[in-house]
A protein has these predicted regions:
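Intrinsically disordered, tyrosine-centered linear signaling motifs in cytosolic regions
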Residues: 65-66, 209
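Conserved N-terminal alpha-helix of the aminotransferase class I/II PLP-enzyme fold
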Residues: 66-101
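PLP-dependent class I/II
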Residues: 1-16, 28-32, 36, 40-58, ...
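Conserved nucleotide-sugar phosphate-binding/catalytic loop shared by glycosyltransferases and other
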Residues: 62
Length: 394
């Protein structure tokens, strides 16, 4: 009996997906010593103690059974209260809210619930690496919208209009942005919303970094704009703002008909998000906002330190007002982002992420995360400054 070779065994769609440029680079880092890594987008803070304590308590009390597919009712109520308080949009916790395994699952579910084969999904780049693969797996056609540094990597209505075709169905709106740290203010969102309404586009608004904005720029959701709540899925979670990456808990809110279909897919693929994490998240939303503010204050201190360091070494970098990343430009050195990152790693043992890992428009930039201590950032900037001087021949 003949056996299939590996190529025949694996679907063509899966084979077409490229491995994450971030993970590929950090597989190399894992084999090296004395590396200061600024590449991972994960808070360096411990999960707030009250959240951990609730997790321990629920385990001790044996609260380890399935929840409803959509998640604990009490958690969904708290999520909807939180969103009403933070973005001033009201949702029905019973029909318009779904608890997911991280925000990433919510992205996947939304695309699978909305897409018919051949529909186009607009993806502003540079961006988080999962949108395009998830669109492909949902049988959509991802269409990149290259964002520009001169616009502070914000999406303009003209850029959006330019990429709309009769097949366009969904716009992914990833702000505050990973990797650039860009934010969209209300005026920006109103202009984008006007285009979405004119062309009947649905929006996936990935707001996972909504709690991490600086210098008084409060996060604004496109769901706040008149006419947009009924055509927007708001995606968020606990990983970034509450330092709960390993708890794997996210959520989405939107129109009941779409959330219902997403819940159906979630039911068959996942059943429910981790029960222990759900109980802990109730405590996070109810009791731990003070810790979120403290973490945000610390991130802002680090952000300002890095911007000052780049100015000192003459490395161009627009000021990011969200997330915990900076995206300096390295075009002056006449090498690709990957070449720059590789040489920096080899010569100075500093790990950053090449900008093109987040899309072609990220070429010529590197992503640096400031979810690290000031001591680590100081050491990294000393090494980076030395590396830049060497490239300039000084």
């Amino acid at each position: 009996m003949s056996s299939q070779n590996s190529k025949d065994r694996i679907s063509a769609k899966t084979r077409s997906l490229k491995p994450s440029g971030i993970r590929k680079f950090f597989d190399i880092v894992a084999e090296m010593d004395d590396v200061v890594s600024l590449g991972v987008g994960e808070p360096d803070f411990d999960t707030p103690w009250a959240v951990r304590d609730e997790g321990i308590y629920t385990l001790e009390r044996g609260k380890t059974f399935y929840t409803s597919n959509a998640g604990l009712k009490e958690l969904r109520v708290q999520i909807c209260k939180y969103l009403e308080r933070r973005i001033h949009v009201s949702y029905d916790p019973l029909h318009e809210c779904l608890v997911t395994v991280g925000g990433s699952e919510a992205i996947d579910l939304a695309l699978r619930a909305l897409i018919n084969p051949g529909d186009e999904v607009l993806v502003p780049e540079p961006c988080y690496v999962s949108y395009t693969p998830c669109a492909i797996l949902a049988d959509a056609v991802p269409v990149a919208i290259p964002l520009k540094a001169e616009n502070e990597f914000r999406l303009t209505p003209a850029e959006l209009e330019e990429h709309i075709t009769p097949k366009t169905k969904i716009l992914v709106l990833p702000f505050p942005n990973n990797p650039t740290g860009a934010v969209m203010e209300r005026g920006d969102l109103e202009a984008v919303a006007k285009v979405c309404l004119e062309h009947d586009l649905f929006v996936l608004s990935d707001e996972i970094y909504s709690e991490l904005t600086y210098t008084g720029r409060d996060h604004v959701s496109i769901a706040q704009i008149p006419g947009m709540q009924e055509r927007t899925i708001v995606i968020n979670g606990f990983s970034k703002g509450f330092a709960m990456t390993g708890w794997r808990l996210g959520y989405c809110c939107g129109p009941a008909d779409v959330i219902g279909q997403m819940t159906k897919i979630h039911q068959y693929a996942i059943m429910c998000a981790p029960t222990n994490s759900q109980y802990a998240a109730i405590t996070a939303l109810r009791d731990c906002y003070g810790e979120v503010v403290e973490m945000r204050t610390s991130y802002n201190q680090r952000r300002r330190f890095l911007l000052h360091a780049f100015a000192e070494m003459g490395l161009p970098c627009f000021e990011p007002f969200g997330a915990f990343y900076v995206f300096p430009c390295i075009k002056e050195f006449g090498m690709t982002s990957e070449e720059f990152a590789t040489k920096l790693l080899e010569k100075e043992r500093v790990a950053v992420v090449p900008g093109d890992a987040f899309g072609e428009s990220g070429e010529g930039f590197i992503r640096i995360s400031y979810a690290y201590s000031l001591d680590q950032l100081r050491e990294a900037m000393e090494r980076l400054g030395r590396f830049v001087k060497g490239l300039r021949g000084r």
